[in-house]
Amino acid sequence: MSEITLGRFFFERLHQLKVDTVFGLPGDFNLALLDKIYEVEGMRWAGNANELNAGYAADGYARVNPNGLSALVSTFGVGELSLTNAIAGSYSEHVGVINLVGVPSSSAQAKQLLLHHTLGNGDFTVFHRMFKNISQTSAFIADINSAPAEIDRCIRDAYVYQRPVYIGLPSNLVDMKVPKSLLDKKIDLSLHPNDPESQTEVIETVEKLISEASNPVILVDACAIRHNCKPEVAKLIEETQFPVFTTPMGKSSVDESNPRFGGVYVGSLSKPEVKESVESADLILSIGALLSDFNTGSFSYGYKTRNIVEFHSDYTKIRQATFPGVQMKEALQKLLTTVKKSINPNYTPVPVPETKLINTPAAPSTPLTQEYLWTKVSSWFREGDIIITETGTSAFGIVQSRFPKNSIGISQVLWGSIGYTVGATCGAAMAAQELDPKRRVILFVGDGSLQLTVQEISTMCKWECNNTYLFVLNNDGYTIERLIHGEKAQYNDIQPWNNLQLLPLFNAKDYETKRISTVGELNDLFADKAFAVPDKIRMVEVMLPTMDAPANLVAQAKLSEKTNAEQ
């Protein structure tokens, strides 16, 4: 019987699911495992600068990967604990990261040896227990016979639930053999079928609400993206012609060039015409909602109707009634078979708000502002772009822009760990290399956030991520924090860097750097056809006033300050 090592089995499983880049760092408890990655044709080891960045990179990769999956490998204790921030972010934002940790050998654990990287108390499962709180499921493997099934179980759960999973793999098991034939049976990635009786009740109730509605809207959020419901959402818009809106976390969940797209709804922080359109609706079909503070304008949704249908990844809610086990993908597919017949015969498609992204004419020498930047940038985006925006001015500014067709938006609105996007850009760029090297990956990051995770630009240079644009918004420190509290406080200051020296510092081969500070320089940059071609890694430092911020961020900062001060 043909056999392969358990280590190779793991990487072959990843390869079957089109997870062909593995992130992480080597350590003495995972070295034998890492040898096996080179035995699988088409796979590569990213080799990150540190574990936190590796976790962010894995998160970004998963958001671009067709199966919504990624993988990373770290070492016991000192390596894996550096991942906790990144893995917690992936858990909160529903991202399927397969987190494998190389742990000491089974015999060392049994003897409770006082090994390095331990707490010195013989407890080898303490870190596993920590990760249980931020993992959908986990396996601390101890037996070679059950190991393949445990690996498959964790990978399946990462896909189905779109959340991180933890696998602890002892160093002595890596080279043990398992039947190669196990790979012939693919992992079952099918979703649990909905309860037929509950689903029938859901569909009939939704159809009745649709038949009675004269002003329905569709509101799409992040989990529609994470749980692969974009095709169903697109079909629902096409079949019903209902106005559709997204949340900040839902940007790129729908085609924003669709004439039925009305904009981004952020509660009280929405544009007035968007706020009126959503809140005056008599039926709201909410798909994949994640109702966090920054995603809802500090919970300021002002629906005037009680006719709200919420489709989620593991339940559906209609008004006050919850239907556990009726997940949205199957429910939407079922609804689509009849929804057109359910529409009120007197329904006339309601006009959607129109947003004209045109800046007020200004002299070329006019200093650049956030408002001008975020209005102008939409005209430079093109179909298929992967657009990544850092927590702060970028994540709020991008809300007012329009994404082109087939774009992917990445922003950590819920978890909000500053510096996340630099690592995520590395992962997204490497995923894009595998899918389409001509697909542009565009990062907008503040000068303060950049300083937390800047090392991962080195990894981008190593892998020649020449599809990458790094826009560094230099507003001299932590503007979002200044807006919330401490405008003049020293703790919101940072040491200025010579940012344009970073690419040569990291030994980039083909690169380009620019610094812009005026309206004319931005216009010229976006008019430059050569600049639009993704043939080298580029960094553009965008000089902006310190307290200049998108209007919605200024308003959100006031709401956040109020929330923080409440007793």
Curated annotation (Swiss-Prot):
Coiled coil: none
Residues annotated for Mg(2+) binding in this entry: D447, N475, G477
One Gene Ontology cellular component annotation held by this UniProt entry: hyphal cell wall
Cross-referenced PROSITE patterns: TPP_ENZYMES
Reactions it catalyzes: a 2-oxocarboxylate + H(+) = an aldehyde + CO2; pyruvate + H(+) = acetaldehyde + CO2
Cofactor note: Binds 1 Mg(2+) per subunit.
Domain of life from the UniProt record: Eukaryota
A GO biological-process term: aromatic amino acid family catabolic process to alcohol via Ehrlich pathway
Subcellular localization, as worded in the UniProt entry: Cytoplasm
UniProt GO molecular function: magnesium ion binding; pyruvate decarboxylase activity; thiamine pyrophosphate binding
EC numbers on record: 4.1.1.1
Family (UniProt): Belongs to the TPP enzyme family.
Something else known: Has antigenic properties. Elicits a specific immune response in systemic candidiasis human patients undergoing malignant hematological disorders.
Name of this chain's protein: Pyruvate decarboxylase
Source species of the chain: Candida albicans (strain SC5314 / ATCC MYA-2876) (Yeast)
Lineage of the organism: Eukaryota, Fungi, Dikarya, Ascomycota, Saccharomycotina
Gene that produces this protein: PDC11
